[in-house]
Each structure stands twice: as structure tokens, then as C-alpha cells.
Amino acid sequence: MPSHTFNPQAGYDLAVDRNLGLGEIFYNRAQKSHQAIAVCDGGAVLTYGQLHAKAYRLAQELSQWLRLTEKPVGIVVQHGMADVVAQMAVIYAGGSCAPMDPTLPDNQIQGRLKRLDAVCVLTDQANRHRDLGADVLCIDDFDIADLAPEDTLYPVATNLEHCAYLIHTSGTTAEPKAVQIAARSILHVAFYAPLEPVYDTDVVAHANNSSFDVSLFDIWVPLLRGAQIAVINKAVLLDPPMMAREIDRLGITVMATTTAVLNLAAFIYPKAFAKLRLVTIGGEAANVAAIRIILKNGPPAMLFNAYGPTECCVFCLAHQITPADVEHGSIGVSIGKPVGRTITYIAGDEGGESDQGELWIGGPGVSPGYFRQPEKNLAAFSDLGEAMTSLENPVRFYRTGDIVRRRPNGALEYVGRRDHQVKVRGFRIELEAVEAGLLKTGLFSDAVAMRIEMPQNGAGSILAAYVVPTDVSKPPTMDEALESAKSILPHYMVPQLELVPRLPLNRHLKVDRKQLAELFGRRWEDVSPAQPENASQDVRSALVSLWATVLASPLSTYGDDDDFLHLGGTSLQAAMLINQIRHKFDIEVSLLTLYDNTTLGALTSIIKQRLSGQSETLHNEKDSWVADSEIADDLSCPLDRPIDWCRDTEGRVFLTGGTGFVGAFLLADLLHMPQTSQVRCLVRATDAAVGQERLRAALDKYGLWEDGFADKLVAIAGLLEDDYLGMGREQFEEAASWASVVFHLGARVNYAQPYSLHRASNTLGTRNMVRFACAGRTKAIHYVSSIGCFGPTGSILGTTSVREDEPLLPHITALPYDHGYAQSQWVADALLRRLMDRGFPIAIYRPGFIVGHSQTGACNPDDFLSRLIDACREIGCYPQLPNQRKEFVPVDYVNAAILHIAASPASLGHAYHIVPPTRAVSIDMDNSMALVDRAGNSPMRPVSYKEWVERLAATSPKRLLPLQPMLAERVKDGLTRWELYENMPVYETTNTARALQNYPGGLQFPVLDTSLMKRYLDFLEAKG
């Protein structure tokens, strides 16, 4: 640190008043620091004087092309000293630098240079022979003396409005936009970098590719401040131990890098940045876990999280990261407050400024606009007119397209994007970029890309495109079209293609996308897979075709080891594949068989076995379930009495499953309780901030969120299946000592998937929650299971009643006939039952099928009942299921019972059935569907289960599609899993009734009648 202090405001104001261009400012610095080192690249060194001389000499050569200032000059050189020299030379000559990534193919660089109308391109020896489509000046051809002539020809006099750079950024078309960067923007970064100045004693890493705007920090901040540049190449950057050695060897003190590089270092060599004075990260959301590791293992003196689109020049917002930002339970790292003279404006949805909305950036960092794209400039840049009447002079603002939220301390928090993009299979895709890429193949004269929901084939959202062949009389084959598209577009942007002679137009003479989507849907409806002529010999090729169809993939071949799930297959697509296999080969194959044979080779073998007459055997894993129920037997029973969590000094709740339907309502009830001081929720999320967003979204979904909740609610990013719940040992132990009680509702719930896929979250997760409850202070664990843990015990075993505390082992015989989720419930319940018998402080709650809130009607639109209702109303019938009850219980009744029972220490050591209190108020399935018929005014007729399944198969309602194979599969005596739930036993409620005796005023059970059903239907219809 220099002995003198630096006032960036005064220095910036003085530089602005002088209004000198970047070349002149550097020239003045070079005169003062002639012998000081400017650039160090490996063993090569340039002083300020030598850099001036080289720039001067190259500027002389450039003068034959640069008759006017601000003419674009391409730069294609290797990363290092050469790109610093080349850029300074262009600035000296009065041109505009257009640096290109040398790893780009020639045709892409040609296209960019042509659109810029570049006068020439500077290269080094490594790139001089490339076909770049412009006059080439190789910087290695000149023997440049150490000293430049003493004249004033170069640098050419410019000013702060000079367009110094043209930096390309991706946009809504396949052609990237060239962003103009003015000298004033770079000057602003140099004086506010980003909140802490760079001093003349600093050594700044040049680690960023010069085609990215962050490299302007690497180069111009040190050169304008009299500091030194030290080049670090990409290979070193991606090897954290080597990077640390280079930082030490070169004496680097300042570094701007990406979040990804910091994340890499955190998990490989977290001390990599320890010797740096200042580190700035950006480019994507800060990773809280990685930053926490860095801060605990030799952090830099200052670490900043910075934000700035290219259009705002490097950094416009920044936040100095402290340990408090990444403490467990924090809301995450903000993108900070405005840097220097930057101004922000948050435009709300209703107009006017808001604390949440789209971010606009104003100030000296904002670009003059996109090069020769006036229409895009009008859309992206504005002075905001009347919204900014408080400003003395008009200020140019850039519309970022980012949604932010202002925190109470004024810092901004990144929320998401708002622009013309879609998300398909996890990838954000710009449709116009897909269309432009298809047109670049030359095979098509027109193209329209779209995301399409596929209710017919269960592929979920797919990327599709309608294309018009350039030569309609001789269209390309599909393989030709796809291969050409894949040569231009990334794999995730290659759409499923449909060739048409012309695109339909709507009455406004625009492409009718709606009509195209409907046409695409009809095209899939018309597909009727044909039986292969020799199915036993052609199984593999037929299966390949089905995979390509169901995965909505343009791939035409798969290998035997390719895995359906690894290729992105969802449960919805798995159901679709099974249906297609059944129809294609006329065989019976279960969904569980697919999950056990997910590779192409294995599934092909299974199909051949079925075709040869081998029948499918029942998937029976009873020995595994019993063994898994014993995996917590090694835990030591706590000797201390559990904490009374409702005591005045306690009230600290640890909750899992808070983003689920029941969990969200229980969370809201806990937050309302005066005894609750804080609730920490374990959430499957990348970091705490995302977890907090997920919790709020879950509460919002059911109309439960209240602003006052924020003070008592803390999200913890974690994983149930991890021994330390994904928190790490230190935070696990801290949270275990903090908590007063544990409510465990978190689970994986998928009726179509086998036990093996539920085991990690539901079995291992339950064991880990017991470990957590026993760690630190002894805490009670309240586990929410369901009556489904007994399986179809009535039909299989003839069970007529089930006591709450009776052993579960006898009922295991019924579980092979149920789904994997129910099997995991049996295992988790049995695991806890074994521990309860040893004295562990545990209570188990087994509700029936939980339906919506009895007062608000808020219910789960994604549960089985909601999907069933939608499907039955769509096809106009429902299945007759005599003597079958789901034991429907409203969520508010369930949670009121749980919280009342859990408040008493005497509740521990028992299980509680939370079902309708008498048989008279328990509605069977037939009467329930009749209620839907009456309440929804949607005529439905009862039909046999067989006919209902056939109607489902014929119409394939989207909402039930993932479950169709399970609903149709016969598992015993010609009956399906659902049919086996007839003759359900009575679930006795002795413990529950006794525990609820002292409920204030008595806990009334809301009977499911027409008015309550109408409330549920109204809520579902409002949710769409």
C-alpha cells in the first residue's frame, strides 16, 4: 500500500475536466513512469517507455488504413503481451479496438470483421496466415526501437467520448452484437475499481480473454494508474495450485476473475488467492459454499462480488464480501451497490420505481450503443424521460433485462432474467438464435423455432422448429438438415425439425406460431407406431427410434451403454417410453423394469425375453427393506431427556420438507406460533439464497406468505442423503446444538419410481435426521409418514384393523404390490419404530391422503388426487372402486393435530393415525368422485376400472400420463396396484384421540362435502 492516500473522486473529476483520450492519458503516465515495468509476460518485460515506443511504431503502420478516428481495427493475437501492445497501438492511432477470440473459427471472425467494416486486422505470427477476410498487419514484422521519436503525431488526440472498443456479446440473434465502449467508461473503471482503488504499487493479473470486457480492467486500470500488468494464461488459471505459485512469483496483488475460477479454486486449492490484496469475481451468481471455503482458508485481503453487463463496461455494481454474507442461514451474497458515478433504477411491473423489478443502469459506464444497430439501441438504451426528472442533466440508461430486489441496506439482489428466452431441459435458449442458426445452414429460406409442450407423447417441453427448404422441389434429408444444424448450433439448441413448403400467417401477416404449435401436436397424435415385420430381430433399431421420439432428440443412434435417465429422461418420459414399448411390441413390461434396465442394451434384452415368452416376475425386495430398516441400529440412544421445545427460552425448530405441500402449511403454522423463535429449514438448493426463494415461493403458492415471516425463517441449503445433511460437519454440529426440536417431513415422492430411487432421500435421509436429533442437545424428532406404509394389507393379508403402535413387519408381505414410495415409507417407519422401542425420543404421524385447506381451499395441484380429478373430468368418467377409501384429511386438520400432539413431551414413543375420526365421515372413492361431479358441474359417469384404464390409454390426459403404466400394470390376480387397495382396514386412532382430548375447544374434523369440494375445485381452476 502506498504511503499517500488516493481520492478517486478528485482524480476522476480532474481527468474528466481535461477530457483527454486514453492514448494521451497513457502517454502522460509513460512520461512520468518511463522506466517502470508496464507488462510482464513470462520472461519478457516491457517498461512504460517501451510500451509507448511499440505502440507508436505500430500506430505509424496503421495510419495508412486509419484516415479517420474511430475506425474499427480487428485484433487477433494470442493472450499476453502482444494483445496489450496491439490494443495500445490502435488507441494511439485513433482507431477502435475490435479484439477477437483467436480460438474462434475463421468464418466467425470474418463475419464479425465484415459487419464492423474493419479497416484491417492486427495479428501475431501464430495467426498471420489465417483466412480472416481483411488486410493483415502482423505485429511481429516490425523491429521496434525502445524509444519513439519525440513528436506529437501519436497518440492521436481524441477525447473521452472516443469509441475505444467494440466488444462482442451474445444477443437475441445468432449474430453477436458489437457493444461500443467509450473512453469515459474505461476511465470510470480505472478510478473506481470497483470500490477499492488500484495503486501504482500494485501488480494486476491479466487473466481474461481480450474479447471479453473484463480484460479492460486487466489492461487499462493498471496502465492508467501506473501499476504493472502480469500475464496469466488460461492453463495456469485452471490449475489453482499453479496459479497460486504464479501469483507469488509475479507478485500479483490485484485480480479480476470469474465466479467459476473461484469455485474451482475453493474445492481444489482454497489458499490460491491468499496473497492477493484485491480479488473481484463476477459473471454468474456467487457460490456461497465456495466463498465460505475461501474465506476460511486464506482469503485475499478484500474480495468483491461485482456485476456489470458489457453494455455498462466491466463493473457497475459491487459488494465487498464478508463472512456474514456466507454464514449458514444468510440470504446470500448481493450484487452490491452502484460503483462510482453509476446510477440504478428499478422499474416495477406497474410502472414507476420499485424495490423489485427490472434493473436499469445509468452513468459514465453506459455504452453509446450497439454498433450500427439503431433499432436495438432504441430498445436497450434510454434517458427514462419523466422517471428521471430529479436529475440535473439527462443520463443515458441501459435496460439490463435482469430482475433485482433491493435489500433494506440498499444493496441489490439478483433475482432472474426477463427477455425473450425459453427453458428447455434445463437450458436457457433464445429462439431467434436457433432460427438464425438454421438459416445459416443455407438449406432453409425461413425458420420458426418454438418451445412446445408435448401432452401427447409425454416428452415434456421440447425445442422444435418449422423450416421451409430453400429448394422446395429438392428438400434436404433429415440427416443432412440435422448434421448441418449441429455444425452451427450447440447441441442443446438443435431442434426437432419439421419441413413445410411455407409458414402460415395470421391476420396481422405475421407467422402464426399458435397454428404451428397445434399442427405439431396433431402430427404427434397421428403417429401410430407400426409393429416391425420381425420384432424379435429388429428390437434394437425399433427401440432406438422410440428413444429418439420420447427424448425429443434429433439423435439417430444410441450406444448399448447409453442410459435413458442420463440422457435426460424424466419420469414423464419414462412413462411414455413404457407405453410406446407396450404398443410397439405387444408385450407387458413394467415401469419398474425400465428403472432397473435403463441402458439401451439392457432394455433391448428385456424386450427380447418378453417376446420369447418369458413373463415378468414381481419385484420383491423384502430382504433389502428389512435390512435397511436396521441401518440406524448402531446409533446410541441419548441418555438425556429431550428438550421441551415450547419452553420460553427455546422454540428453535429444525424443519425438513418446507417446500412441499404439507410442509409449507406446517411451516406457516410454526411461524405463527408465539412459542417459535426461529425456524431453520433444510432445503435442496445450491445455496441459502436460493433455498430462501424456494421457501417463499412455496408459501406464496398457497397464499401463506407474510412479510413478518422473514424475521423468523432461515433456509439452509442441504441434502437429506448426506451424512451431515449437506451442511458440512461444522454447520451440522452447530445446528444440532442450536435446535430445540426436529420436524421431519422431507422426502422424495414419486409413485412411478422404484424403492431404489427413493432410498437415498427417504431411508438414508431418515437415519441422518435421527443422527442430527441425537447430536448436540437431545431433541425430539417428529416424523410425518402416512398410512401408506402398511401397503394394501387389507387385500393381501385380510387385515381388518391396524393399531397405531403395532409392529410393521407383518405388513411387509403387502408391500411388493405397492409403489416404491410406499415401500420407502415402510422402511423409514420401521427404522424409527425400532429406535422408539429402544427409548429414542420419536413420534410418528401417519395421516391419510392429505387434501386442501378446509377454509381457503388451497390444495396441491400436483398431487395424485388433483391429477386424477383433472383426467377424469377431461375424459368424462371415473373408475368404480368399491370399498376403497383414501382417508381424506384436510391439511389444516392434520397440522393442527400434529402441532398439538408434538407440544406435549408425553407424545413421544408413539405413532398417531391422523384420519377421519369415525367411519361415518370417511368418504370412499366412489362418493368422492361423485362429489367432484356435483361440485364441478362436469358430467362424469362411473365405469369399470378396466374401461377407465382403456379410456386413459386412448386419450392420454397429460396430468396422469406419468402414472399411466403404474395404473394399468396388473401385479396380482389380474388386479392393479390401485385395485388392491380395496377392502382397506380401519386405521385405529386410540393414541390420536387421547392426545387430542385437551385440544382447546376440541379439534373439529372438516367433512368432505360438496361445498368443500367446490372450494378445492375453485382453487385448482384459479391455478390453471
UniProtKB/Swiss-Prot annotation:
<dbReference type="Pfam" id="PF00501">
    <property type="entry name" value="AMP-binding"/>
</dbReference>
<dbReference type="InterPro" id="IPR009081">
    <property type="entry name" value="PP-bd_ACP"/>
</dbReference>
<dbReference type="InterPro" id="IPR042099">
    <property type="entry name" value="ANL_N_sf"/>
</dbReference>
<dbReference type="InterPro" id="IPR000873">
    <property type="entry name" value="AMP-dep_synth/lig_dom"/>
</dbReference>
<dbReference type="Pfam" id="PF07993">
    <property type="entry name" value="NAD_binding_4"/>
</dbReference>
<keyword id="KW-0560">Oxidoreductase</keyword>
<feature type="domain" description="Carrier">
    <location>
        <begin position="534"/>
        <end position="611"/>
    </location>
</feature>
<dbReference type="Pfam" id="PF00550">
    <property type="entry name" value="PP-binding"/>
</dbReference>
<dbReference type="InterPro" id="IPR010080">
    <property type="entry name" value="Thioester_reductase-like_dom"/>
</dbReference>
<keyword id="KW-0511">Multifunctional enzyme</keyword>
<comment type="similarity">
    <text>Belongs to the NRP synthetase family.</text>
</comment>
<keyword id="KW-0436">Ligase</keyword>
<feature type="modified residue" description="O-(pantetheine 4'-phosphoryl)serine">
    <location>
        <position position="571"/>
    </location>
</feature>
<dbReference type="InterPro" id="IPR036291">
    <property type="entry name" value="NAD(P)-bd_dom_sf"/>
</dbReference>
<keyword id="KW-0596">Phosphopantetheine</keyword>
<comment type="pathway">
    <text>Secondary metabolite biosynthesis.</text>
</comment>
<feature type="domain" description="Thioester reductase (TE)">
    <location>
        <begin position="655"/>
        <end position="898"/>
    </location>
</feature>
<keyword id="KW-0597">Phosphoprotein</keyword>
<comment type="function">
    <text>Non-canonical nonribosomal peptide synthetase; part of the gene cluster that mediates the biosynthesis of the alkaloid (-)-FR901483, a potent immunosuppressant that shows efficacy in animal models and a probable inhibitor of purine nucleotide biosynthesis by targeting phosphoribosylpyrophosphate amidotransferase (PPAT). Within the pathway, FrzA catalyzes the reduction of L-tyrosine via its C-terminal reductase domain to produce L-tyrosinal. The biosynthesis of (-)-FR901483 starts with the condensation of two L-tyrosines to yield (S,S)-dityrosyl-piperazine.</text>
</comment>
<protein>
    <recommendedName>
        <fullName>Non-canonical nonribosomal peptide synthetase FrzA</fullName>
        <ecNumber>1.2.1.101</ecNumber>
    </recommendedName>
</protein>
<dbReference type="InterPro" id="IPR036736">
    <property type="entry name" value="ACP-like_sf"/>
</dbReference>
<dbReference type="InterPro" id="IPR045851">
    <property type="entry name" value="AMP-bd_C_sf"/>
</dbReference>
<feature type="region of interest" description="Adenylation (A) domain">
    <location>
        <begin position="29"/>
        <end position="425"/>
    </location>
</feature>
<dbReference type="InterPro" id="IPR013120">
    <property type="entry name" value="Far_NAD-bd"/>
</dbReference>
